[in-house]
Amino acid sequence: MGVYSIKEISLMVDMPENTLRTYLGHYSFAKYYKGRKIEVSKEFYNTLLKYLWNKRSYKYIKNVERLIKNG
């Protein structure tokens, strides 16, 4: 899919940048970092979706599911 900044990803997922930055600080996202940007793929979205379910952040789950579905 590509390499994006946290700001670009927050716009895609429709999540505040600070919230996304906090979530991406979790160790399970370390393998996606490419310098200051993040490599976004279907695997990244699936990891984010799992993390959101664990955090019970239901208002963002629909947005991530939509991105996975649309590819």
Where are these regions (language model features)?
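Helix-turn-helix/homeodomain-like alpha-helical modules used for DNA recognition
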Residues: 53-71
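Alpha-helical DNA-recognition elements
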Residues: 26
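Hydrophobic transmembrane signal anchors and adjacent membrane-proximal interface regions, especially
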Residues: 8-11, 30-31, 38, 66
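Short helix-start
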Residues: 30-57
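Residues in the recognition helix of alpha-helical DNA-binding motifs
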Residues: 23
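Terminal low-complexity, poorly structured segments
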Residues: 16, 20, 45-48, 63
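Polyanion-binding surface elements
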Residues: 1-19
